[in-house]
Swiss-Prot record:
Gene label: NCP1
Induction: By galactose and on the plasma membrane by iron or copper deficiency. Repressed by glucose.
Chain residue numbers at which the record places covalent cross-link Glycyl lysine isopeptide (Lys-Gly) (interchain with G-Cter in ubiquitin): K666
Keyword Hydrolase: no
The protein's name in its UniProt record: NADPH--cytochrome P450 reductase
UniProt-listed Enzyme Commission number(s): 1.6.2.4
Note: Present with 46600 molecules/cell in log phase SD medium.
Cofactor binding remark: Binds 1 FAD per monomer.
Binding site for FMN: 67-72, 78, 116-119, 152-161, 187
GO biological process: ergosterol biosynthetic process
Record topology, Cytoplasmic segments: 25-691
The keyword Lipid biosynthesis is annotated on this UniProt entry: yes
One Pfam family linked to the record: Flavodoxin_1
The protein's enzyme class: oxidoreductase
Length: 691
């Protein structure tokens, strides 16, 4: 076997990989089956037969999505709305998680499939049944199916759009007929929206021919009945993350008062932040360490998992959004689906202010697709002409909108010179503005040493607008929320600080009072080898060090427990390549020497500083080359390699450096070394947690 791993070790490793995969999938299925949220089911009748639902609801087009973080769902819904607006089609848009597909060959309409790739070429967790069905479909079993497909992936990963390509391969083998080209969005290149627009334009031309469609001027038709109500009741949402937290509901707890899950995208846990501190502060950057207490729930996590943190929008951005659309935040409204295959996107009834603060993603970049949809609501002819031009010209859109980091309100105020967009219906905003999604952070604690506490390490995004020096700074929604909490928790008067944005820290009905936020744990395959004697190479600059702090704390706790039990355990070599700009932003600087002492010399840390005064820039990939002999020996002795951090630059640079190390160490070509790196990734010995 290659790289010093014998047959027994390889068998154990393969079993481990399979076990982790099964655990992740099993957990998703278990969570789906255990959920008691009635809004999760897309069809009110509970019918899971996809062909029957399409037929019974008189649909003439089907859009399916398999989404891990909500992006595929967002684009599927955009596409569905355009089919309705331009061609008056009766479209069903559905999550594959909610249906069975044995009758897929009997679906009498064309199907569009939007599918995200998760991890190492995997299908999203909710697509277990869909993946199983298409991968086991026999030749000719889907010969009646006509479909098109759009994949969402990241080219910095080894298996770029792997799920979409796998789905397309198996659908084709089963006889399904693909219409048009396979679309591939590349988040790694930052071109997801433009990739979608190019694919969508080509597919619409195909559909015009296939279905003999006549395009009409886009006209918004809501999927919901919108009703204004008069009074607030206990059953009305004021921004609660799910209906479970309304006063009219009772949370599910055991005899000890522990809140029971499952906790996931549909129902997060409201976790107290018991401690937060600033790791460093400079003129342009801050880093916050936050500790979330999970002891009031039955949530379990493993070292290497991610914590999903649900933010609310900053008060300044909420006010800006309300102003440009001339909306009254106190207006109470309800939404009722006009179609049984459609679900309400968030708890209603609610107020306009609550929806905008808690449920809609109002601070993100605006898309050309949204501009195209907004043309019908332009406040005057000049603005309509501008919108039309920008929605069709991606280069001009990039110059005027994207490069300036405009959100929706910024862009519309810029285009209309401050004129209100007061003819835009609230239903349009609900259906066109993306839903708020959680932000995922690599957990920086160990489940062995902090069993019921999760640590998160976050750089606060806050920088001047590069194109508009007089504009407000560009800010990250969740990281600035964590900074607001850190200051308040440490008795700093926020009113006296120069913060770029502020938040309602109490939340709906004071649900978030005393520093709480909605969270859930997302399982990861980013795991230490089960054999403690296995060598480990960790590479993580900046906040990419977060999971490795968890890894090392795990090894410290393990070694201490073994010593207490009288066991003499020998740890394999653990080396961490860490990078920071300078000594001022060296994360957890005081902790690492203590870990080295406790691990009896089995832990070594190598630091690269990229911005020390009067010195050459040094990055982690440079340090890998400096330690080439040691790195090669460790890999040859079966080391596991872990990389965490920036996908575009660092992760590629690290991969290139390791290819060079293997090429020189084994006296093989670069291509051969590249194939060896691919083998390591496939076997689970080279793992990445990158963004």
């Amino acid at each position: 076997m290659p790289f010093g791993i014998d047959n027994t070790d390889f068998t154990v490793l393969a079993g481990l990989v399979l076990a982790v995969l099964l655990y992740v999938k099993r957990n998703s299925i278990k969570e789906l089956l255990m959920s008691d949220d009635g809004d999760i089911t897309a069809v009110s009748s509970g019918n899971r037969d996809i062909a029957q639902v399409v037929t019974e609801n008189n649909k003439n087009y089907l859009v399916l999505y398999a989404s891990q973080t909500g992006t595929a769902e967002d684009y599927a819904k955009k596409f569905s709305k355009e089919l309705v607006a331009k061609f008056n089609l009766n479209v069903m848009c559905a999550d594959v998680e909610n249906y069975d597909f044995e009758s897929l060959n009997d679906v009498p309409v064309i199907v569009s499939i939007f599918i995200s790739t998760y991890g190492e070429g995997d299908f999203p967790d909710g697509a277990v049944n869909f993946e199983d069905f298409i991968c086991n479909a026999e030749a000719g079993a889907l010969s009646n199916l006509r479909y098109n497909m759009f994949g969402l992936g990241n080219s910095t990963y080894e298996f770029f759009n792997g799920a979409a390509k796998k789905a397309e391969k198996h659908l084709s083998a089963a006889g399904a007929i693909r219409l048009g080209k396979l679309g591939e969005a590349d988040d790694g290149a930052g071109t997801t929206d433009e990739d979608y627009m190019a694919w969508k334009d080509s597919i619409l031309e195909v559909l015009k021919d296939e279905l003999h469609l006549d395009e009409q001027e886009a006209k918004f038709t809501s999927q919901f009945q919108y009703t204004v109500l008069n009074e607030i009741t206990d059953s009305m949402s004021l921004g609660e993350p799910s209906a479970h937290y309304l006063p009219s509901h009772q949370l599910n707890r055991n005899a000890d008062g522990i809140q029971l899950g499952p906790f996931d995208l549909s129902q997060p846990y409201i976790a107290p932040i018991v401690k937060s501190r600033e790791l460093f502060s400079s003129n342009d950057r801050n880093c916050i360490h936050s500790e979330f207490d999970l002891s009031g729930s039955n949530i379990k996590y493993s070292t290497g998992d991610h914590l999903a943190v649900w933010p609310s929008n900053p008060l300044e951005k909420v006010e800006q959004f309300l102003s440009i659309f001339n909306l009254d935040p106190e207006t109470i409204f309800d939404l009722k689906p006009l179609d049984p295959t459609v679900k309400v996107p968030f708890p209603t009834p609610t107020t306009i202010g609550a929806a905008i603060k808690h449920y809609l993603e109002i601070t993100g970049p605006v898309s050309r697709q949204l501009f195209s949809s907004l043309i019908q609501f332009a406040p005057n002819a000049d603005v309509k002409e501008k919108l039309t031009l920008l929605s069709k010209d991606k280069d001009q859109f990039a110059v005027e909108i994207t490069s300036k980091y405009f959100n929706i309100a910024d862009a519309l105020k810029y285009l209309s010179d401050g004129a209100k967009w007061d003819t835009v219906p609230m239903q349009f905003l609900v259906e066109s503005v993306p839903q708020m999604t959680p932000r995922y952070y690599s957990i920086s604690s160990s489940s062995l040493s902090e069993k019921q506490t999760v640590h998160v390490t976050s750089i606060v995004e806050n920088f001047p607008n590069p194109e508009l020096p007089d504009a407000p700074p560009v800010v990250g929604v969740t990281t600035n929320l964590l900074r607001n909490i850190q200051l308040a928790q440490n008795n700093v008067n926020i009113a006296e600080t120069n913060l770029p944005v502020h938040y309602d820290l109490n939340g709906p009905r004071k649900l978030f009072a005393n520093y709480k936020l909605p969270v859930h744990v997302r399982r990861s395959n980013f795991r230490l080898p089960s054999n403690p004697s296995t060598p480990v190479i960790m590479i993580g600059p900046g906040t990419g060090v977060a999971p490795f702090r968890g890894f090392i704390r795990e090894r410290v706790a393990f070694l201490e427990s073994q010593k207490k039990g009288g066991n003499n355990v020998s740890l394999g070599k653990h080396i961490l390549f860490y990078g920071s700009r300078n000594t001022d932003d060296f994360l957890y600087q005081d902790e690492w020497p203590e870990y080295a002492k406790k691990l009896d010399g089995s832990f070594e840390m190598v630091v690269a500083h990229s911005r020390l005064p009067n010195t050459k820039k040094v990055y982690v990939q440079d340090k890998l080359k400096d330690y080439e002999d040691q790195v090669f020996e460790m890999i040859n002795n079966g080391a596991f390699i872990y990389v965490c951090g920036d996908a575009k630059g660092m992760a590629k640079g690290v991969s290139t450096a390791l290819v060079g190390i293997l090429s020189r160490g084994k006296s093989i070509t670069t291509d051969e070394a590249t194939e060896l790196i691919k083998m390591l990734k496939t076997s689970g010995r080279y793992q990445e947690d990158v963004w």
